[in-house]
Curated annotation (Swiss-Prot):
Its EC number is 3.2.2.-. This is Putative 3-methyladenine DNA glycosylase. Belongs to the DNA glycosylase MPG family. GO terms for biological process: base-excision repair. Gene3D superfamilies: Methylpurine-DNA glycosylase (MPG) (3.10.300.10). InterPro entries: Formyl_transferase-like_C_sf, MPG, MPG_sf. Keywords: DNA damage, DNA repair, Hydrolase. CDD domains: AAG. One of its GO terms (molecular function) is DNA binding.
Length: 212
């Protein structure tokens, strides 16, 4: 299902937004839009509700102690997709942050989609599948309104209430509090222990009628 909207409602984030450490950019991406321009000109979009940060000095980072053709994008210019395949099955979509020659990035873990099942993009693999993102999109810029871009938050999410917790599915640096999610969202891949899913009547649900 696509969600037509006027492109002016989805102003691309500037590259300067991404020229900061991942642990700064990660929480600030919560509430921003992931947008895809489809072949018919319509826009498929959702609200980012969960992210994780990774840095070169972090043992869980792909760029920790190694630089290779497979992770070269992670060492490159900020504001580009870094897409890799996890366990040979799922694509995971990251955004490169900080500076060139320093592996740093934010993993997009979950997106809330208007008018669709609440968990259709609740996890990195599901997110990539819903938007059709794969290795061919590795190194593609996210700062311009091309096929894909990231856009600023809507006014209703100027100050989102976030949960800060540890990352998921890693064997090292498990204690770093570098995962964030929108507390009122039901589209988060996994909630922190003790944090109950909000009732449907109280949950954040993106709507096609938003006015920005």
């Amino acid at each position: 299902m696509s969600h037509p909207a006027h492109p002016r409602r989805f102003s691309a984030l500037p590259q300067a937004f991404f020229c900061r450490p991942a642990e700064v950019v990660g929480p600030e991406l919560i509430g921003c839009f992931l947008v895809k321009r489809q072949n018919d000109g319509s826009l498929l979009w959702g609200v980012i509700v969960e992210t994780e940060a990774y840095s070169q000095d972090d043992p869980a980072c792909h760029g920790y102690r190694r630089r290779s053709p497979q992770n070269e994008t992670l060492f490159g210019e900020p504001g580009r997709f870094y897409v890799y395949v996890s366990y040979g099955i799922h694509h995971c979509v990251n955004v490169v942050t900080d500076r060139s020659d320093w592996a740093n990035g934010v993993l997009l873990r979950a997106v809330a989609m208007p008018g669709e099942p609440e968990r259709v993009a609740a996890g990195p693999g599901l997110l990539a599948r819903r938007f059709g993102l794969n290795r061919t999109h590795d190194s593609q810029a996210v700062c311009g309104e091309n096929e894909f871009w990231l856009a600023s938050r809507p006014s209703v999410l100027n100050v989102p209430e976030l949960v800060t917790t540890t990352r998921i599915g890693i064997s090292q640096a498990q204690d770093l509090p570098w995962r964030w999610y929108l507390q009122d969202s039901r589209s988060v891949s996994r909630r922190a222990r003790g944090d109950r899913m909000p009732a449907l009547s109280q949950a954040f649900i993106p709507t096609l009628e938003w006015k920005r």
